[in-house]
């Protein structure tokens, strides 16, 4: 979900989240900003990496505000919490406040990553999931799950319905970055990777239906 998506796409995603919320599920969302700017591009553009990463964090804030607005228009209470202080437009992130908002039925949208350079949105998602005591980390992406190589480039790419954290790391699969996967592995937090563009995939994943790929420990496969 990003600000360059059509209003219809943004609205559809907001309604998917609403459907899940109506199941009684507490939802925290970590949003990226790669559609606007990626800090990793900074050095190629002659920009200091740290500066570039902060630019990327601000991009996530823009996307978070768009999503918050879309959610509110569906009738869902939502709050943006930012890892960087931007008091006029978002609350500062504090895990106890985030948990309180979740318990009150609000969707919390986490912006600005971890608030530190050199950490990806994936790592921020793993960190926030652990901090709020999430049962599962759902990575919504543009492909159907985890493959042995890029399915958009290789038509014969092999799909995994489930895979262990350690296999993701050993095979160098581009599910999430190594830091994020390691955090999930060390804390036994399952990850579901699914295609956000397919209607009701998010809801199906939450209900435990087989959509996408589940990444978990070897002993639970």
Name these PLM-found stretches.
Residues 4-221:
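C-terminal catalytic "cap/lid" subdomain
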